[in-house]
Amino acid sequence: MKNADRGVAAELDGSDLRVAIVQARFNAAITEQLASSCIAELEALGVLAKHIKHVTVPGALEVALALQALAEQKDHDALIALGCIIRGETYHFELVANESGAAVTRVSLEHGVPIANAILTVENEAQAWARADEKGRDAARVAVEMANLMEDLS
């Protein structure tokens, strides 16, 4: 929801964090914008460029498998899922949106690693472009906040 009241987040310091991003290439121009915004925000929050791993996969359904492989490495404090699913004329939209979202959550819970899910699910390309920049930055902030919280809780 645009302009939603998100409350006040803790101070975000990513200087000691290692973060990995999995970007779906389907709807590539949009997901490139998501990735660019996300990486810029991670660096603004103090995450060193050398501590940001960025991989790509064909589409949203492949994101979770790459996240799982990264989670199993135990080298990252947080993971980020980036993608863009635009509604078409068939049920395929619901399938991809539901299954990719559930799989990302499952990986996070099974491996105890925070995953910021910025796989956009939109009605049309205009909605995707309207959200790409902010959602990329949001994903970075969520990843840093949750990585720090998990450290505090351990």
From Swiss-Prot:
It catalyses: (2S)-2-hydroxy-3-oxobutyl phosphate + 5-amino-6-(D-ribitylamino)uracil = 6,7-dimethyl-8-(1-D-ribityl)lumazine + phosphate + 2 H2O + H(+). Disulfide bonds: none annotated. GO terms for molecular function: 6,7-dimethyl-8-ribityllumazine synthase activity. GO terms for cellular component: cytosol; riboflavin synthase complex. Its EC number is 2.5.1.78. GO terms for biological process: riboflavin biosynthetic process. Pfam families: DMRL_synthase. InterPro entries: LS (IPR034964), LS/RS (IPR002180), LS/RS_sf (IPR036467). Pathway: Cofactor biosynthesis; riboflavin biosynthesis; riboflavin from 2-hydroxy-3-oxobutyl phosphate and 5-amino-6-(D-ribitylamino)uracil: step 1/2. Belongs to the DMRL synthase family. It comes from Leptothrix cholodnii (strain ATCC 51168 / LMG 8142 / SP-6) (Leptothrix discophora (strain SP-6)). The gene is ribH. The active site is at H92 (proton donor). 5-amino-6-(D-ribitylamino)uracil binds at F26, A60, L61, E62, C84, I85, I86, N117. It is an enzyme of class 2 (transferase). (2S)-2-hydroxy-3-oxobutyl phosphate binds at E89, T90, R131. Catalyzes the formation of 6,7-dimethyl-8-ribityllumazine by condensation of 5-amino-6-(D-ribitylamino)uracil with 3,4-dihydroxy-2-butanone 4-phosphate. This is the penultimate step in the biosynthesis of riboflavin. Keywords: Riboflavin biosynthesis, Transferase. This is 6,7-dimethyl-8-ribityllumazine synthase.
